[in-house]
Amino acid sequence: MKNLTGIFSALLVAFNEDGSINEQGLRQIIRHNIDKMKVDGLYVGGSTGENFMLSTAEKKEIFRIAKDEAKDQIALIAQVGSVNLQEAVELGKYATELGYDCLSAVTPFYYKFSFAEIKHYYDTIIAETGNNMIVYSIPFLTGVNIGVEQFGELYKNPKILGVKFTAGDFYLLERLKKAYPNHLIWAGFDEMMLPAVALGVDGAIGSTFNVNTPRARQIFELTKQGKLAEALAVQHVTNDLIEGILANGLYLTIKELLKLQGVEAGYCREPMTAKATDKQLEVAKALYAKFL
């Protein structure tokens, strides 16, 4: 297994206007991340990949393309989580057979699952695949909150390496790192990277890293070195960019920023707005000129 720490892009997926996967565009996004952004790895099949609007076959195809293009150049994490446990297991087996370095799974959502059911979900995926696992915690979208003691219960399974922590609860983050120092934490909010790194995270997984990895790496390294004023200056610029992206449409705008760099990033998947308006294109061009 490769080193899983550092800067990981949450991989965007290029779609054609009819919603089908644009394989050429997806390969270009992967190459851009590896060759230009110099990421340490890719997190494939997450929220940024518009994953929860895709069929099982489409998810498998994205895993296949990403592994075929990246090969062993960087670390690859496959997000296989689903409210359908059978699908999660099927995807986990497939990604493991392809040679992904680790699996990740979002907490099961929509229904109010008990913690015992959530633990069973993770233990089952691990038992069926034999691969390592990263818990994907994103409570503002799933409504699932896992406490410090509950993480301890999950961590009794030695295959669970840590958590992708996409939350703003830095008290919980600090408590987790203190309680379980041997388990890894990846920051999931790009706009709050500096405080997360100051609290000891081992890496970061972010959507804006598809276009902004150099600054993300600066924040990560400067904060680790204790150069907080310098790191904060970079975080300010990063957040100015992120603010513009969020106001203009997150995934759509990042795709337009990639297109401005010659990457065939395609469209978004409906029911998201698939194609940028003229106004959104103007904003993307202004963001590109100012920040990239």
Swiss-Prot record:
GO terms for biological process: carbohydrate metabolic process; N-acetylneuraminate catabolic process. Pathway: Amino-sugar metabolism; N-acetylneuraminate degradation; D-fructose 6-phosphate from N-acetylneuraminate: step 1/5. Its main location: cytoplasm. SUPFAM superfamilies: Aldolase. It is found in: Cytoplasm. Aceneuramate binds at S47, T48, T166, G188, D190, E191, S207. Keywords: Carbohydrate metabolism, Cytoplasm, Lyase, Schiff base. It catalyses: aceneuramate = aldehydo-N-acetyl-D-mannosamine + pyruvate. SMART domains: DHDPS. Belongs to the DapA family. NanA subfamily. Homotetramer. Catalyzes the reversible aldol cleavage of N-acetylneuraminic acid (sialic acid; Neu5Ac) to form pyruvate and N-acetylmannosamine (ManNAc) via a Schiff base intermediate. This is N-acetylneuraminate lyase. The gene is nanA.
